[in-house]
Amino acid sequence: MRFFFKTVKILILFLLLAFVGAGFYAGNAAYETMLTAPWEKILGVTKQTADLSRIHRREQKDGWQPVEIRSADGTKLRGTYIENSRSSDRTVILLHGLYQNRSMCIPYVDMYRDMGYNVLLIDQRGHGESGGSHTTWGLRETDDLDAWTEWLRGKDGGVKIGMHGISLGAAMALIYSGTESRLLYTSHAADDTP
């Protein structure tokens, strides 16, 4: 009988060690998968980097001005400037959402032009035609917005700048306009977060 209980104890210990080992293996495999996961597929979002055909058609057809500038760290930033047919000292910067590009903001262009604004559509860092491989969640995007506001002030020193963002763009607009020094440059920020 002692032999039976000793064998059962050893078997239970062996099974316990096997379960712990399997748990470590499964946990490590899950961790490795998370590090290399195609997040746009997992999250169900498609990266709209490649399809800028709507923007390019409007630039050619309607005379929208393609713009390229450099951020403070040298990253190439691309955008499209749309001057209002009426003379205006007000410009709104439209900021797209995560995994998108500036064409996401086209539906807002006519609304702002009807209200008398010039419009600047930008591709945020790591999106569309702008450089960078990913978003930095506001660490560098505020510097990028500094570069865009400087570009606008270079066109018109008295420009009044507003921002309208969608999702990630709304967060960037609010982060940017929430710092005291930058409030001097932005007249308003609109949040369009779902």
Show where each model-derived region lies:
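Conserved small/polar residues in nucleotide/adenosyl-binding loops
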Residues: Y185-D192
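Conserved alpha/beta-hydrolase
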Residues: Y112-G131
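Alpha/beta-hydrolase fold nucleophile elbow
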Residues: D156-S167
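Alpha/beta-hydrolase active-site loop
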Residues: T136-D156
